Amino acid sequence: MLISVQDWQFDVDVALNMEISSGQAADHCLCGYCRNFYQAVDSTYPSLRPFLARFGADIEGPDELSPFEPTIYEASYIIHGKVLSCGHQPIFVDGIPVVVKNGKKADMDTERPEPYFVMLVGLMELPWLLSEDPADVVSLANEPSYLARMEKKLLERIGDNALYC
């Protein structure tokens, strides 16, 4: 299916993306950070779910969900298809940057066959809606090695200049 977003053009296998993404949504992580994301994202960024759905991606089925802090997130969605033309303007949904990376350039740990591209959604700030204190959440996100990896990832992302095909 051909999809246009601003001056970007995509050819996407929506049915395959829906099949994979809905399976991931049914089997997603239940740590506090992820539960907070699933609970807060729709009310905070109401246009994000319909935007991702155009590509067949379920907002609750990211391939990777990275909390940089308890309320700062980046969600990565692998989209089967091709970027036909990269736009000259960055994509924003509800003020959130959406960075598009083609295939293996995205540095995602995946066994999926190409062609695919990755949509990195965020950084997005969400309110903390859970009753537990985020400092008490048991998650890899509280480990120093994870935080160091996320810091490195963020610094690399800043260098992407929000346009990377």
Residue ranges and their predicted role:
Residues 1-42:
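Long, hydrophobic N-terminal alpha-helical segment
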Residues 27-72:
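Short, well-structured hydrophobic secondary-structure segments
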Residues 32, 80, 120:
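Residues in well-ordered beta-strands of folded domains
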Residues 36, 82-86, 124-126:
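Generic structural motif
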Residues 48-52, 79, 150:
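Generic structural signal of hydrophobic/aromatic residues within well-ordered alpha-helices
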Residues 59-116:
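Amphipathic protein-protein interaction modules
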Residues 101-165:
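Glycine-rich, aromatic-bearing surface loops/beta-hairpins
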